[in-house]
From Swiss-Prot:
InterPro entries: Ribosomal_uL4 (IPR002136), Ribosomal_uL4-like (IPR013005), Ribosomal_uL4_dom_sf (IPR023574). Keywords: Ribonucleoprotein, Ribosomal protein, RNA-binding, rRNA-binding. The keyword Cell membrane does not apply. It comes from Pseudomonas putida (strain ATCC 47054 / DSM 6125 / CFBP 8728 / NCIMB 11950 / KT2440). This is Large ribosomal subunit protein uL4. One of the primary rRNA binding proteins, this protein initially binds near the 5'-end of the 23S rRNA. It is important during the early stages of 50S assembly. It makes multiple contacts with different domains of the 23S rRNA in the assembled 50S subunit and ribosome. Residues 38-72 are annotated as: Disordered. GO terms for molecular function: rRNA binding; structural constituent of ribosome. It comes from the Bacteria. Part of the 50S ribosomal subunit. Belongs to the universal ribosomal protein uL4 family. GO terms for cellular component: ribonucleoprotein complex; ribosome.
Length: 200
């Protein structure tokens, strides 16, 4: 199949990588797994056994008329532990490499189908100036955009850093969430070739 390039002639690309069916279930699974992997999972609360003190029983077992109590750190006591205390946990989900690659192929194909993939021969700025990048993007009619190149250009990265709806990634740093989060994905021809190598 052919992909139109903004400032040059169309290029031939793999049907497998850029022309497959959209598998919504697989893409959803990949997005959930990616976001779950980003969770810290470090919150922790104290149970009755973690709270300091409470070793001595507050009153004797019998003869007081009060309910029996063996510690002052039980969950029903002020200053006591939490009943079902949160514990650190690993939220990450396993996703096979084959499935992850298939999800990325599915996303790329859908971007092509929905005219959200803008292919250019090359994309760079001469100096790390946000204004220069903004003018360049405005000239192309792009405001909410992910810029993907085969290697991150330092000037481009610094210029885009302060723009809220613009992000710069290389092919290796692209993930399912970032690829679908933006209105348009601006990608260089070299990045297209690299995606074909990785996902073909």
């Amino acid at each position: 199949m052919q992909l139109n390039v903004n400032d040059a002639q169309a290029i031939e690309v793999s049907e497998l990588t850029f022309g497959g069916e959209f598998n919504e279930t697989l893409v959803h699974q990949a997005v959930v797994a990616y976001m779950a992997g980003g969770r810290q999972g470090t919150k922790q609360q104290k149970t009755r056994s973690d709270v300091a003190g409470g070793g001595k029983r507050p009153w004797r077992q019998k003869g007081t008329g009060r309910a029996r109590a063996g510690t002052t750190r039980g969950p029903i006591w002020r200053g006591g532990g939490v009943t079902f205390a949160a514990r650190p946990q690993d939220h990450s989900q396993k996703l096979n490499k084959k499935m992850y690659r298939a999800a990325l192929r599915s996303i790329l194909a859908e971007l092509v189908r929905s005219d959200r993939l803008v292919v250019v021969q090359d994309f760079a700025v001469e100096a790390p100036k946000t204004k220069d990048l903004l003018n360049k993007l405005n000239g192309m009619g792009l405001s909410d955009v992910l810029i993907v190149s085969d290697a991150v250009d330092q000037n481009l990265y610094l210029a885009a850093r302060n723009l809220p709806h613009v992000d710069v990634r290389d092919v290796q740093g692209s993930d399912p969430v970032s690829l679908i989060a933006y209105e348009k994905v601006l990608i260089t021809v070299s990045a297209v070739k690299k995606f074909e190598e990785l996902l073909g």
